[in-house]
Amino acid sequence: EDISLESLLAKNALETRWAFNIPTLARKVPGINGGHLVEIGARPNTGKTSFHASLVCGPGGFADQGAKCVVLCNEEGAHRVGARYLTAALGKDVHNISQNKETALQKWQMMKDRVYIKDSTGKDMAWVETLCKTFKPDVLILDMGDKFAKTGGFARMDEALKANAIYARQIAKMYDCAVLYMSQLSADAENKVVLNQSMMEGSRTGKAAEADLMLLIAKNPPVEGQDEEDTQRHLNVVKNKLTGWHGIVHCDLDYKVGRYTA
């Protein structure tokens, strides 16, 4: 390997090829690059799908930056994930978009050329690797990452998830793409704002050990008498080999259009 001063500086300058479009996050972790494994976790109904939809299709997102993005969804239907990407791209809910199709068409057509969404129910990581060979994505989203794991041959689930994360990291490095690995958090994270690595569902240390960056998304606990859910979200940066900063940054989720803003 070339470890000359020029080479090291040049390679590290590329660490933020794909910039985050959430200002509070970008100030601490500017972005990601090919070869990075980013593990993202949250409790159900926190906004995991909206999070990656906003990063990819929101204003200044990965697609706007020219990244070829592949989204593999094995939980929600591809059409539902696609709708989240559509609203994040256009900043309007589906009803408003349907009322103004001609206005929406040009913007969405440009996004659609850079974003590929595919149902991957029942598939494994070997299938994911084959797809990467063909499509050569810049950014690969696994939603949900754990559901690509093969459980046969492992004594415990955490061992299977560790092997799955190792495979995801190998794909990131071999095919020079940034992999966003979406995960559920365990019940330990319910109604908590400050989260940690041990709250990953079904995992011990192994899965977390593979990540270059780990972001855990929290929301404010409900308050008695509250008519609707608080839109504030808290991004816990619990592992960060990219810039070394750890802590919590705050933002808001516009759930009607699936955009994270700050």
What are these regions (language model features)?
Residues 154-168, 178-182, 215-216:
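A short alpha/beta connector and helix-capping loop motif
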Residues 25, 142, 177:
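Catalytic phosphate/metal-binding cores of nucleic-acid and nucleotide-processing enzymes, i.e., regions
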Residues 6, 65-155, 163, 228:
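Conserved inter-motif catalytic segment of the P-loop NTP-binding fold
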Residues 1-92:
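The Walker A/P-loop phosphate-binding site
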Residues 74-76, 177, 181-184:
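Conserved H-loop
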Residues 109, 125-140, 170-175, 187-262:
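C-terminal regions of RecA-like/P-loop NTPase motor modules
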Residues 38-40, 70-72, 118, 180, ...:
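Hydrophobic/aromatic beta-strand patches that form the interior of the parallel beta-sheet core
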Residues 59-62, 88-92, 144-151, 171-174, ...:
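Conserved, well-folded catalytic cores of nucleic-acid-processing
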